Amino acid sequence: VTRAASSAASVALFPARPEDALEAAFEICRRLRDFNDRREEAGEYPVRIGIGIHTGQIMLGTIGENQRMDTTVIGDTVNLSSRIEGLTKAFGVTVLVSEDTVDRMGTRDRFRHMGRVRVVGREEGVDVYEALDAPATSTLETDPKVRWVNREAFEMGVQQFAAGRMDDAYRVFKKLYHDEPTDRAVIAYLKRIIYYRKKGLPDPWDGIFRVASK
């Protein structure tokens, strides 16, 4: 862990393999599940977290003066990781991974493609993926088995959305919502599709899911 990115977030580096970052994220989920189980037994609400993982070049250095020195990292990779972490709230998932990271791992079998998303502060979109085998952090989360089963249909709905076929996308996500009404990613897409069906698509349409907040 190199530094706190904000009052509620930290930045960690994994120089060897992207799988190391993913396994660290899973271990955080497992530890949080133990903590949340105790909270639920005490009648308290579980704590939720979001983890964003991206792979790329960074600048690492030491700043400050003799009285206080601090090692920190800067660069677009760091910023995008933070933005991806912010997307976990919009989609209601725990671990989101960039396409660059998924490609480095060499397989997409364990991920659900969430679409091409434009985050605050960036002009271009970025493809992000949910880590489907991330351990549940509380009993209130959607059953991961359901997401595995519905992954193909979800990704088909994302493709229809990206192609601008909102009626087809609506039918796909409506059925997914019927099958699992607690999947917040499905709800997020349904809300956006309903809006576009009512207001019409922007011209030109770029197929990007836009998120208004960090």
Each predicted region: which residue ranges?
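Alpha-helical scaffold within the catalytic cores of cyclic-nucleotide enzymes
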Residues: 12-51, 76-89, 110
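Helical mechanochemical/support elements of P-loop NTPase systems and associated helical scaffolds
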Residues: 17-20, 24, 59, 65, ...
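Intrinsically disordered, low-complexity, charge-biased linker/tail regions
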Residues: 202-214
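A short glycine-enriched loop-to-beta-strand structural element that forms part of the catalytic core
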Residues: 8, 45-61
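Cytosolic regulatory/linker segments at or just downstream of nucleotide-handling modules
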Residues: 58-60, 88-166, 174-175, 180-185, ...
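Conserved helix-loop-beta segment at the catalytic/binding core of cyclic-nucleotide signaling proteins
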Residues: 1-15
